[in-house]
């Protein structure tokens, strides 16, 4: 099995890159975020590889990091999620945001993925919630905030600040993570306006 490829970018397709490794061109399928982050043709690149072997084909999937590859594998343990859907999810949400979305039970964020409906998004969030800590470093403040929101214990200022950031166009996981950090910095008595200001500062980093 191929686990990693290091070579020169030859060309790009709609959902793949041709990587020239010592004269052999490998067609590697990638998430759109991965393709956008790769260099121009003629430049060097390294990809972690997941190899799929079928009776009629061998297909390679490429990732910038081993963590992204592990997410690709984990997503496919969910019913109705195959390689195509897993790549689509990773195109919509990078690993850190996906981890926060699952920690926050934010199925709406996952459902923004083209081809992923509410039922599949619900399964992803439900079935993977206990597996996230082993795979990604989820912000403890986000986990704590998730529990508070679930139990309706989140301070009104926190809930309002998250809502305001979402209304500004940020995703729920990003908004919640930013407000969690802002709340930790400003203290539990911080007002909505202060949390929004600090949250925006965090999101601009």
UniProtKB/Swiss-Prot annotation:
Entry annotated with the keyword ATP-binding: no
Keywords (A to Z) from UniProt: Cytoplasm, DNA damage, DNA recombination, DNA repair, DNA-binding
Region (Domain III): 154-205
Signal peptide: none
GO CC field: cytoplasm; Holliday junction helicase complex; Holliday junction resolvase complex
GO BP field: DNA recombination; DNA repair
DNA-binding in keyword set: yes
Compartments (UniProt record): Cytoplasm
Region (Domain II): 65-143
Record-level Gene Ontology MF annotations: ATP binding; four-way junction DNA binding; four-way junction helicase activity
Sequence segments annotated as region (Flexible linker): 144-154
Location of region: Domain I: 1-64
Task performed by this protein: The RuvA-RuvB-RuvC complex processes Holliday junction (HJ) DNA during genetic recombination and DNA repair, while the RuvA-RuvB complex plays an important role in the rescue of blocked DNA replication forks via replication fork reversal (RFR). RuvA specifically binds to HJ cruciform DNA, conferring on it an open structure. The RuvB hexamer acts as an ATP-dependent pump, pulling dsDNA into and through the RuvAB complex. HJ branch migration allows RuvC to scan DNA until it finds its consensus sequence, where it cleaves and resolves the cruciform DNA.
Assembly description: Homotetramer. Forms an RuvA(8)-RuvB(12)-Holliday junction (HJ) complex. HJ DNA is sandwiched between 2 RuvA tetramers; dsDNA enters through RuvA and exits via RuvB. An RuvB hexamer assembles on each DNA strand where it exits the tetramer. Each RuvB hexamer is contacted by two RuvA subunits (via domain III) on 2 adjacent RuvB subunits; this complex drives branch migration. In the full resolvosome a probable DNA-RuvA(4)-RuvB(12)-RuvC(2) complex forms which resolves the HJ.
Family: Belongs to the RuvA family.
Free-text comment about domains: Has three domains with a flexible linker between the domains II and III and assumes an 'L' shape. Domain III is highly mobile and contacts RuvB.
Protein name: Holliday junction branch migration complex subunit RuvA
Species of origin: Rhodopseudomonas palustris (strain ATCC BAA-98 / CGA009)
């Amino acid at each position: 099995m191929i686990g990693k490829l290091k070579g020169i970018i030859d060309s790009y397709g709609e959902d793949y890159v041709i990587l020239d490794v010592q004269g052999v061109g490998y067609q590697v399928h990638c998430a759109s975020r991965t393709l956008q982050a790769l260099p121009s043709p003629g430049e060097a690149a390294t990809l972690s590889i997941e190899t799929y072997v079928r009776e009629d084909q061998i297909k390679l999937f490429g990732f910038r990091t081993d963590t992204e590859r592990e997410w690709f594998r984990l997503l496919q343990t969910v019913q109705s999620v195959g390689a195509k859907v897993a790549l689509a999810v990773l195109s919509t949400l990078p690993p850190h945001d996906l981890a926060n979305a699952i920690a926050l039970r934010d199925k709406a964020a996952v459902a923004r993925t083209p081809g992923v409906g509410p039922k599949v998004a619900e399964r992803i969030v439900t079935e993977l919630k206990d597996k996230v800590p082993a795979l990604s470093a989820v912000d403890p403040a986000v986990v704590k905030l998730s529990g508070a929101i679930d139990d309706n214990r989140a301070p009104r200022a926190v809930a309002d600040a998250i809502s305001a950031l979402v209304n500004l166009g940020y995703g729920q996981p990003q908004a919640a993570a930013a407000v969690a950090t802002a709340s930790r910095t400003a203290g539990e008595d911080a007002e909505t306006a202060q949390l929004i200001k600090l949250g925006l500062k965090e999101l601009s980093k």
